[in-house]
Amino acid sequence: MMAVAAAQKNREMFAIKKSYSIENGYPSRRRSLVDDARFETLVVKQTKQTVLEEARSKANDDSLEDCIVQAQEHIPSEQDVELQDEHANLENLPLEEYVPVEEDVEFESVEQEQSESQSQEPEGNQQPTKNDYGLTEDEILLANAASESSDAEAAMQSAALVVRLKEGISSLGRILKAIETFHGTVQHVESRQSRVEGVDHDVLIKLDMTRGNLLQLIRSLRQSGSFSSMNLMADNNLNVKAPWFPKHASELDNCNHLMTKYEPDLDMNHPGFADKVYRQRRKEIAEIAFAYKYGDPIPFIDYSDVEVKTWRSVFKTVQDLAPKHACAEYRAAFQKLQDEQIFVETRLPQLQEMSDFLRKNTGFSLRPAAGLLTARDFLASLAFRIFQSTQYVRHVNSPYHTPEPDSIHELLGHMPLLADPSFAQFSQEIGLASLGASDEEIEKLSTVYWFTVEFGLCKEHGQIKAYGAGLLSSYGELLHAISDKCEHRAFEPASTAVQPYQDQEYQPIYYVAESFEDAKDKFRRWVSTMSRPFEVRFNPHTERVEVLDSVDKLETLVHQMNTEILHLTNAISKLRRPF
C-alpha cells in the first residue's frame, strides 16, 4: 500500500540524528527519560519544519523553472493559430448553440479562508499560500515514498483518504468526479456524521491509483472550500503523519539507535571521563547491544573483577535497606531471585538468566540496549512486555551514583518488580498508551513513568514504602524520599504528568499510590482522555499489537473473551460441587 511506504518514509525523515548533549539543546547533563522526551519533541519539530520548508521551496523552484522552460519552448504553430481562431468562433455563437464543457475538477477559490486557517496551523504544517507551489506534509511524505523508483510511482496501488465535508454529503460527488479524472478506481466509500464542530460529514474512501495521480488528486481537493481537511491513511486506518510504532516484537529491531557520543566521552563530570579503559569497555558493550536482533540469545558478558566489586557494594546496601523500606512485592521477588541463585553478591546476573526468570513469572523478557533509545521507542517496548536493559556497569569510583542507567540499576531496581504480575501489567499499560501518541503525550507519559516506575512510593499498612527503581538502587535518595524533608502527594496521573522534574538534586515531590491496582485504574481513566483515535491490545500468543479499528477485529476479541469466561464459569461450577 502506497501509504505504508509514506508512513515508513515519515519515520526515516524525522529520526533523531542529533547528539543528546547540552550543545544541541539537551536540557541537562544527566540523562533521563523525561529530558529525553522533551529533547526529542524539540528536535522533531525543528527537523519537521526544516524538511517541509526545503520540500516546499524546492517545489516552488521546480515549478517556476518549468514555467520558464515551457514559455521559452512554446512557439505558436499554424495548428495553434487555427485552434485559437476556432475557439474564438465558438465564443461568438448564440448561447443555446454553445455549452462550455465542465472542467473535470472544478473547485472554488478559498484564498481568504486558507489565509485565516494558516494562523491556526501548527508550525511546520501550515497550508501553502497562493504564492506557494503548495505541499502539505501528506504530499511531501507521499512524494518521497514515490521517488523510490519510477516503477513505484507509476504502479497502480491502494490508498485510503479521509475527507471532512463542510457543506454536506452532496460534496461527495465532486470527490468521486475528481478521482475519475485522475484515473482512480473507488473500492469502498463510507460516510458518517462528523463529531468535529463545523464539519458535516466524514468520508472514508479506499481507492486504487498511481502515486503521481494521487498527489495531483490531493492537491486538487485541498483547494476546495467544501472540505475542512483531508488525511492520507496507512495500514489500520492510521494517518501517515502519525508516529510510527512497532506492531510485532521483532520490529523493535527498527527502533532508533541514537547517533550520539558515549556519555563518558561527552561529559567532563562523568566519573569515567578520564578513564580510557572504562570508556573503551562501555563502547564494546554498547556495540554488542547494537548488533542484537530479535530471536537472538542475549550475549554473555564476562564481567571483570572491578565490575563485580562495584556490584557487590551496591547489592549489599540494597540487601540491608530493602526489608525496611521496599514494598512487599519487591521484597518477595528479591527473595525469590536469591533462592534461585540469580541474586548473589559474588557475580553479576546475566540478562539471559534474568529474562528467563521474568518470562516464567510474568511474561516479561529482556532485550540488551546500549542505553541510547528514544523515549518513544523505550516505552513502546513495554507494550510487548519487553524491557530494554543496559549491560554496562557504572564506574567503580562512583558505586552509589550513576549519571545514566546501568545494569546495576536495571537489575536491582527494575527486575524484581517486573516479576510481580500487577506491576508488570502497570508497566505494559504505560507502553500500550504510548503507541501512536503525540510527542507532547510522550512527554507526559515519560513524566508519569518517571514519578512511578523510577521514583514511585506506595502505601503499605499505613507506612510509605518505595517501589521506584531509581530509589531502590540509590540509597541516598531512598532515605530522602521516605523522610519528612520532601512532599508526598497522592498519585493522580493528570497532575503527575505535568509535574516539573529536575535532576540537580533530590526531588522535592514524590507521588504515593494507594496500591498498584489503584494506580492502574487511575492511569487507564487518564489514558482514555488522550488524543489517539484508536485502541490497541497486545496478543501474547503472536507477540503482536493489534489496532482495534474494525467490527471484525472486535468480534474476534469478543469470541476470545467469551471462551475465557466459559473457562472461568466452568471452574466456578466445579468448585461449588460437593465432595
From Swiss-Prot:
Pathways involved: Catecholamine biosynthesis; dopamine biosynthesis; dopamine from L-tyrosine: step 1/2
Pfam short name (any one): Biopterin_H
Region (Disordered): 105-132
Superkingdom per UniProt: Eukaryota
A cellular component annotation (GO) from this entry: perinuclear region of cytoplasm
Record family assignment: Belongs to the biopterin-dependent aromatic amino acid hydroxylase family.
Name of the featured protein: Tyrosine 3-monooxygenase
Organism: Drosophila melanogaster (Fruit fly)
